[in-house]
Every structure is written in C-alpha cells, then in structure tokens.
Design a protein with these regions (language model features):
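Glycine/small-residue-rich loop that forms an oxyanion/phosphate-binding "nest" at active or ligand-binding sites
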Residues: 93, 99-136
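N-terminal amphipathic alpha-helix/helix-capping segment at the start of soluble metabolic enzymes
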Residues: 1-46, 271-274
C-alpha cells in the first residue's frame, strides 16, 4: 500500500508532486511559495495554525530547530530523540493544511542539529514516514543510499546544498548540482550567501543553467541582503520555489520576505507571462 503522502503516479515530465489529495503541490511549473515553521512545540502550534490564512503552497518543517529545543547545541543519538521527533512529525503532517517538506538542517550547513552522518540518516529516514517530502543534504556520507530509502518510504527528496559564507565558483556549483541529479533526487536545491551583486547574479546564472540542463525542478537562492532580489526574480529563470516567512515569525534564512510580499511579486510576474 502506498504511503498516504506519496506523490501521485506518473506526473508530467519535469513536474514533481509533493503530498496527495487535498494536501498536494507541484514543483517544476508555477513557482511555489514555501513557508518554514520552526521552534519548540508551542511555537510550532502557533505557526501551524497561521498556515490556514496564508497564501503559501508548501510548508517546510525545520525539524532541527525542534531537536535543538529538546537537547540544545549538542551532538545527540538518534535513539534519544526519535520518538519525540516522530510525535511532532505526525502532529505537523496531520495539522498542516499544506503538504509538508521535513528538513533536518545540520550545523555544518547553517542549521541547529548536531548529528553525525549515521544519526542524521536515521532521523531523516524516520521523517520520510510522515512527510510528503524530505530534505537530504547531498554532502552527507550516505546521501545517495538515503535518497533511495526515502523514495521507498513514499516521500519525494529535495537534495540540498548550503553555503552561509559565500558563493562557490561556477564549477563547484555545477558539480554539486550534477551530484544531486546523479543521486536521483526529485528536486535540486542550492542556497549560497551572496556577498555582492555579482554573487547574486552567479546564483541566478546557475539556476538558469540547471533548469535547462536537468529535467527536474531546481531551486536556486542567494541569501543575504545582496541576494534578496533572487527570491523574487528567480521565477523568471525557472526557479521551482521560493521561501518566505509567516507574518510575525522569523524566517529560516537571511533575506526572506513575507509570504504576502512574495505572492504579490509572483502574481505580477505571472500576469506578465500570460
């Protein structure tokens, strides 16, 4: 029997469906708005309630921030937190009106989870039992096998790469995207800190190149004040999604706009394309 959040069969070429039935969205066509929720159980409850009135398409649960609320900034064993994580994953999946992308962002890539490769893979596998999509950090040892295991659980995979210090060279970005594609990820995501307008332009160029090179959705983001415009104009270069904040709540990365701000710009861009 398929997982209740498994993607619909045989999506159109280049399209990936996250979720199912009333809770689903397609990546690879119209740019989707992803809104992160984070924090401890009380904060999550308030944010999940607010989802009903926002114009987002997908919710990203930053599970690493929940883990941090339990254990702080310490390396942990998966067995110590697995059941608490599963209970919260079930709550978010059941309560959210939107399809869920579950993410454990590790400290190595700017997140709050301190996990070695084995513990990271164990917890991501567990999340795949609840969420329609799961983020997999491509730089982790065992990421290719983990992608296969997430697929077997019925969830889609957003392979990700983050650099909070700067924007890598064009060749390195191309190698990272090629590795994601080779590993069989459904969606390719990269986010880099833009320390200049030139960095932001290179991220957009990499986004446009990958969109043409690979028959799967690509999400390219330049973080920081110099990169903020890429969150709004990336749709014109084939970006499958952009991340935005719930009004009154903090974002998950530097440079994010609110859902309403992003939606207003996307509406204008899409109207100009009609």
């Amino acid at each position: 029997m398929p997982h209740p959040s498994a993607p619909d069969p045989d999506p159109a070429p280049g399209l990936v469906t996250i979720g199912k039935a009333a809770k689903k969205a397609s990546l690879g066509g119209r740019t989707q708005v992803i809104v992160p929720v984070s924090g401890d159980a009380a904060a999550l409850s308030g944010q999940v309630e607010a989802l009903a009135s926002c114009r987002a398409d997908i919710v990203e649960w930053r599970a690493d921030t929940f883990l941090s609320s339990l254990v702080g900034a310490h390396f942990v064993s998966a067995s110590d937190v697995e059941e608490d994580l599963a209970r919260m994953a079930r709550y978010v999946a059941d309560s959210s009106p939107l399809p869920v992308l579950a993410t454990i962002r590790t400290s190595v890539e700017g997140g709050e989870a301190y996990l070695d490769d084995e513990e990271y893979c164990a917890l991501v596998r567990r999340l795949a039992s609840f969420a329609g999509g799961v983020d997999v950090e491509i730089s982790r040892d065992g990421s290719s096998a983990l992608i296969d295991e997430v697929h077997e659980a019925g969830a889609i995979v957003v392979a990700s790469f983050h650099d909070f210090e700067g924007t890598p060279g064009d060749e390195q970005l191309a190698e990272v995207l090629a590795a994601m594609n080779y590993a069989g990820a459904d969606v390719l995501k990269f986010a880099c800190m833009a320390n200049s307008a030139t960095d932001a332009a290179r991220v957009l160029a990499a986004q446009a190149w990958a969109h043409e090179a690979y028959d799967r959705p690509v999400i390219g983001i330049a973080m920081g004040s110099s990169g903020a415009p890429t969150r709004l104009v990336g749709s014109a270069l084939g970006s499958a999604a952009t991340f935005a904040t719930l009004p009154g709540w903090e974002g998950s990365a530097p440079g994010q706009f609110t859902v309403e701000q992003v939606r207003a710009v996307l509406d204008i861009v899409e109207a100009s394309e009609d």
